Amino acid sequence: DAGHNVLALSRNVVPIEELSLRNCESFSFDITKTSDIEKVSAYIKAHWSQVDVLINNSGLLVNEPFSEINIQDFRRVYEVNVFGVAAITQAVIPFMKKDGHVVTISSIGGIQGSLKFPGLSAYSSSKGAVITLSELLAEEFKETGPSFNVLALGAVQTEMLEEAFPGYKAPLSADEMASYIYDFALTGNRFYNGKILQVSSSTP
């Protein structure tokens, strides 16, 4: 509604389409598939030629003790949370200018020294990986842009959280956090580059 042109990507586009948003295009997208990454590049070339903001918000959470999680599930988490983020970022950067902004959504659990929760070995370590990746990219692209920042979120009431922790009530709704991410994506690069901001209304 603010006049921005948005490409919203999700494996399930039905909830996006039901919103009937103006200036918002969406299509089914699997971040682990090279062919889907190429579809995004083709769309940008055909319709925009330039991207101002990329929000990396893909996430897969498996809540299982390290002694029990199989390596296939561990790898699946990394395919989405790390390799997928790297792939889509690499594809979109050529369309961004110096004042562009790449915002990657991580987790407080991925920050060194933070409180860790048993069962989240794959998830938390993957979120730590994208923190380091963003810091590195900010350094690599500091002369040409775009800027890279990370929002390390605390608990937010999302479908992913509800599936992983049935019955848990997070202090923030998905809508509340989405509003914060939106504002930060548009203005945060004026003040930050290569930074990790912890976003949580609860302690720890």
Model-derived regions, located:
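Conserved NAD(P)H cofactor-binding loop of Rossmann-fold oxidoreductase domains
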Residues: 57-62
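Catalytic loop of short-chain dehydrogenase/reductase
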Residues: 103-129, 134-135, 139-143
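Conserved glycine-rich Rossmann-like NAD(P)H-binding loop of the short-chain dehydrogenase/reductase
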Residues: 4-16
